Amino acid sequence: LIYLTSDFSPLTSKKMEILNSKIFGENLTNTPLLVFHGLFGMLDNWGSFGKDLGEYLPVHLIDLRNHGRSFHSDTMSHDDLADDIARYMDHYGIQKAHVLGHSLGGKAVMQFAIKYPERVDKLIVVDISPKAYPPHHQGIIKALETVDFDTVNSRNEVEAVLNQYIPERSTVQFLTKNLYWDDNKKLGWRFNLKTLSEKYTEFVSNAIKFGVFDGETLFIAGAKSNYILPQDEFGIKQQFPKAKVVTVKNAGHWVQAENPIDFANVVKEFLGLN
């Protein structure tokens, strides 16, 4: 089932949009797991994981704002992302959940856990830490902005443009999963490139606001990735004192895609599903 809807939120007095999601195992009654993708991603990236974990507990794969089939907005702060999660849970009557986020999604769930600690059972953060990161997506953003949808008429033509700027074929393939045909039979990006470009520094380069989440927390690092370094553990423990850091072998930043079996097993063990 896929949901795209609006609701009145207790967080505000005005009508607010609810994040788009796909739910696995929704007939199960144990604590649900909410899963959030990274920058330029969407819930479809997590389909196999959702189907697997959905045998054990309800799994909500969720599109962040300005991504996938979720609503577009001109704001994109960590607080915005955290409030979106709270509003989503209110809409579905979820008082408390396990939350998992990869990369940008990891920043969203960290901010959520600090802002709404009573609503988090267990926190899982995938290949990102609470620290500030230097900007490192400028080349990708420039490539995406170079695509002129008034002149390109096929996925192959879009790939040809991106290939001029992005050497990694896997990155180009990942980005082009976001292509869709609009009502005017014109190609476009599902993500809101304008806001993601304008607010990039705010949501990628900024550290998570200081605060403490004292619940059970797991940080999962890719062995081939440099997003979580040994020296980051001190800063992680300052905000997440019960955090454990586990490294998944044979995986870079895209841990769940590059070593899905070991990744899923680490998550299952942490959630007590094995």
Whereabouts are the PLM-identified features?
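Alpha/beta-hydrolase fold catalytic core
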Residues: 1-34, 54-57, 94-95, 201, ...
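Serine-hydrolase catalytic-loop signature spanning alpha/beta hydrolases and amidase-signature enzymes
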Residues: 40-48
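Conserved alpha/beta-hydrolase catalytic His-Asp/Glu region
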Residues: 135, 150-204
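Catalytic active-site module of serine/aspartate enzymes centered on a nucleophile-bearing elbow/loop
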Residues: 243-274
